[in-house]
Amino acid sequence: MINDKLPKIWHGGDYNPEQWDSQEIWDEDVRMFKLAGIDVATLNVFSWALNQPNEDTYNFEWLDDKINRLYENGIYTCLATSTAAHPAWMAKKYPDVLRVDFYGRKRKFGSRHNSCPNSPTYREYSEKIADKLAERYKDHPAVLIWHVSNEYGGYCYCDNCQDAFRVWLSDKYGTLEKLNKAWNTGFWGHTFYEWDEIVAPNMLSEEREDNVSDFQGISLDYRRFQSDSLLDCYKLEYNAIRKHTPNIPITTNLMGTYPMLDYFKWAKEMDVVSWDNYPAIDTPFSYTAMTHDLMRGLKSGQPFMLMEQTPSQQNWQPYNSLKRPGVMRLWSYQAIGRGADTILYFQLRRSVGACEKYHGAVIEHVGHEHTRVFNEVAQIGKEFNQLGDTLLDARVNARVAIVFDWENRWATELSSGPSVSLDYVNEVHKYYDALYKLNVQVDMVGVEEDLSQYDVVIAPVLYMVKEGYAAKVESFVENGGTFITTFFSGIVNETDIVTLGGYPGELRKVLGIWAEEIDALHPDETNEIVVNGSRGSLSGSYSCNLLFDLIHTEGAQAVAEYGSDFYQGMPVLTVNEFGKGKAWYVASSPDAEFLVDFLQTVCEEAGVEPLLSVPEGVETTERVKDGQTYLFVLNHNNKVESIDLKDSQYQELLSTQQLSGTVELEAKGVFILAKV
């Protein structure tokens, strides 16, 4: 478990008592926290200016008081380092802490996420305050976990970053000769002869808006560099804390599929993954499920923390709808069912001013417990106390994996062609969504993950094939695995240089095909996938769009063909028998109906069964602990649904009822079923 001081699902959230100067409010907060079953408060996230009013003065007395007061009332602390927004005095005295944006404009003090990651000043003072906090609270029994900074993100293009980029490149490539080759700088006369000739790629040099770059290799490396730079800032604080508190876990809150940081690399430096879940009004339930699975996958299935979710509404979406009754509870159990061991909110008391005053909270502006949201939070708190440690450390066992890679995403998005509408994350989600509808458990994995534990591995739009990965795929398939990849795969290496010899490059052998050309049409234009006869659930015709690989089989079998255009009759879906396994290639972006039928067929052939057969709009997921399975059934619909449990006998953990046969699950309802 994360910390055995609190052996249950943690329940709490961000608390900012420094925003009020009222003992009466602070006392009321504690009273209501206890009513709601709140047992963890995240403190000190944005308090740097309060903690350090000037260069030489530190003030932690206010924090002592709040940590002690909460602990005396049975509430533990998730202690943040306060470095997510630097103080105004620092920006005034040391302007090197201020970022330069993509357009070359130097920021002034304001907002947050505003510190240059390569500022010597920022690094010095952030490390110093983390050190002082850790030294002060190293023996405090209230501290469960350290929370470094907050939601790292954004890039900087200042001179400090540009200089550091050159050093980073020198460390990576060693010589300019190797760098020039890796970036293909013979194109457009870009050969570099001195390291200081290299400039940061932004609107003033190689890039334009919307990920348009003239030199993808340069832009790709700058993204790697900025991700590493922010990670270095995190590691400075991590190490400062670790020397004082070797046994208290350390984390920082990630943001799901956030594009700018390579979270698989970050997760290696985190004791536990934590993330903030803020779906938009139109976010599919399956997308949120996929993101939970991705966060779990960052550390190879280790349970994660849900660090933030709103109890009711957000404040920064275009349309900030209320969570309908039951939805917060439902989504909380969705997170737990997919690997979360904590449910924490932003925020515990609603701010009275600035941009988050309309962001939802456990305690609303009215200031009492007689609200719908508070009562729902209190219900969850009661249930978590009832569950105790039953679900802690339970794992999710999946036989199907989907590959997700941030560097591949960057390269795909930076690609100059063939279509501005190609969206890597959307293509990945389409495959996940089909498996979600089929109630098949999925792991989201990085390219370093061991594939041998899976029966089926899907790598949509694997544009960049990193060194050794093709051999890894070949070994997986040779030993009986089923591999699926798609159009626009196997095109380039890690520096965005095309692999010569025909697409899909290093994957050509295992797939048994050659892609001669790639057609790109407007997203509204479609072609047909016409199945040759039938195979499993696949039959008839389906729609496809976006990109269309014109492929020739080289040992693979054509399972389906294009139905129109000049490439009518050419293969669009192939399967290649390779060793003991199979490798599938989907040459276009298919509709949802095709993906459900296709992946159902693939899973049946691989012997992968669904968790349960349930109505549309009902989600299933399963965790396992000490040989005991816990099946979560989540009704996202606005009506009661009938769930057929067959002849199996279950104990439902929330109601403690014994269930079997056909049972009714209320709208927005949850079952946690332990097989008897």
From Swiss-Prot:
Gene: bgaP
Entry binding sites for substrate: R112, N150, W316, E356, K357, Y358, H359
CC annotations in GO: beta-galactosidase complex
Role according to the record: Hydrolyzes lactose, o-nitrophenyl-beta-D-galactopyranoside (ONPG), p-nitrophenyl-beta-D-galactopyranoside (PNPG), 5-bromo-4-chloro-3-indolyl-beta-D-galactopyranoside (X-gal), o-nitrophenyl-beta-D-fucopyranoside, p-nitrophenyl-beta-D-mannoside, o-nitrophenyl-beta-D-glucoside, p-nitrophenyl-beta-D-xyloside, p-nitrophenyl-beta-D-cellobioside, p-nitrophenyl-beta-D-arabinoside, p-nitrophenyl-beta-D-lactoside, p-nitrophenyl-beta-D-galacturonide, p-nitrophenyl-beta-D-glucuronide and p-nitrophenyl-alpha-D-galactoside with highest level of activity with ONPG as substrate, intermediate level of activity with PNPG and lower levels of activity with all other chromogenic nitrophenyl analogs.
Disulfide partners: none
Family according to the record: Belongs to the glycosyl hydrolase 42 family.
Keyword Nucleotide-binding belongs to the record: no
Biotechnology: Could conceivably be developed to fulfill the practical requirements to enable its use for lactose removal in milk and dairy products at low temperature or a reporter enzyme for psychrophilic genetic systems.
Name recorded for this polypeptide: Beta-galactosidase BgaP
Thermal dependence, as annotated: Optimum temperature is 20 degrees Celsius. Lowering or raising the temperature from 20 degrees Celsius results in reduction of activity when ONPG is used as substrate. Rather stable at or below 25 degrees Celsius, but loses 58% of activity after 30 minutes at 40 degrees Celsius. Loses all activity in only 10 minutes at 45 degrees Celsius. Exhibits 27% of maximal activity even at 0 degrees Celsius, but enzyme activity decreases with a further increase in temperature until it is undetectable above 50 degrees Celsius.
Binding site for Zn(2+): C116, C156, C158, C161
Organism: Planococcus sp. (strain L4)
Transmembrane regions listed in the UniProt entry: none
Activity's dependence on pH: Optimum pH is 6.8. Exhibits above 80% of its maximal activity in the pH range 6.0-8.0 using ONPG as substrate at 20 degrees Celsius.
PANTHER family, per database record: BETA-GALACTOSIDASE GANA (PTHR36447:SF1)
